[in-house]
Structures are given as C-alpha cells and as structure tokens.
Amino acid sequence: MLIDTLRTVHNSDAEAVAQLVNKAYRPEAGVSGWTHESDLVSGSRTRISQIEVILSKQDTVIIVGLKGSEIVSCVHVEKDGSHSHIGMLAVNPVLQGAGLGKQMLAHAESYASENFGSEKFIMGVVSSRAELIAFYLRQGYQKTGLITDYPESAGVGIPRHAGLKVEILEKRANHT
C-alpha cells in the first residue's frame, strides 16, 4: 500500500501541504511526474496562507495521505449546496502513476457523499491537459461543456501563454 493513513488536515500541516501541492503542480526542473503544469503556468500553485484560509472555512476539508509521518498526497473538498467541488489533488511526483491519485479521488468523493450529502462532484482542469482530463474521464467524470478563463486573480499561478482555459468536469454521486 502506498499510504499508511488517510486523515483530514490540521492547521500544523499547512506548510507541508503547500510544499506537496507546489512540488506536484510546479516541480523544479528535472523532477518527473505526469501531472505537473510547469510548462503552462508559472509561480506557486498555492501558499501556506491560502491553505490556512481553506482550513478556516466551514464545509471544506483537505484530506491527506501519509506514508509514515510524511504527507505524500492531498485533495481539497468543499461543499457548495447539493454538490462538492474537488480540487488540489496532489501526489508526490515520486509516487505518481501507482494509483494513489485514483485512491485519493475516490476517498474525496466518499467523504463528500457521506459528510456533505453531495449528489454531484465538480472540478476544473486546465483544458490543454488532455492526459489529465482523460484520467478524470476514466474515473467517471464527464465534460460539462463549460470552459472558463484560467483564474489568474485566484493566486494560483500566472499562465505562460495567453488564453489558458479551465474545463469543468462533473460526476454524479453513487448513492446506494
């Protein structure tokens, strides 16, 4: 098993989560991993202060996967009415490609269904990341046809090229 423990984030984890997310989304040159977007977006994906703001909100959680005491994966889940937004899915680049992202996504969906009563999961993916969109489609997500501008004002990085877009995907919860 790739992780030993799944749990929600504590305030004391904010720095480790920010480091993991930035390592996964915007790694340094020479670091492998298939989910990074360094060629599309520059700057940090998140900051400690942004993680702290997320943790201060109600109906939102960051779930982490630990190997020993090290945070090696995370995902953010935020309730919005009858659905939940899922984002900031990150896996340490060394562990990518072994199923941990799929496991974290499934756990996020279960958490949203069980704790928030979510009927649908929604996420935004950089539209030019065809391999990442294909991953989510294999997990049961569907394209909504909704495409928005990259959220430059959100403090999640600066597009390297004009016109960067985000495609909105959704998945219905499997309530049984």
Regions found by a protein language model. Give the residues of each.
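Conserved N-terminal entry element of GNAT/NAT acetyltransferase domains
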Residues: 1-15, 167, 171-176
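Conserved GNAT-fold acetyl-CoA-binding loop/helix
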Residues: 22-51
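A short helix-loop-beta-strand connector motif used in the catalytic cores of GNAT acetyltransferases and
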Residues: 46-63, 162
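C-terminal "cap" of GNAT-fold acetyltransferases
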Residues: 54, 119-134, 138-176
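Conserved beta-strand in the GNAT
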Residues: 64, 70-78, 85-90
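Active-site acidic-Proline motif in GNAT/NAT acetyltransferases
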Residues: 79, 92-98, 127-128
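Conserved acetyl-CoA-binding loop-helix of GNAT-fold acetyltransferases
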Residues: 91, 97-110, 138
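Conserved acyl-CoA
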Residues: 103-120, 142
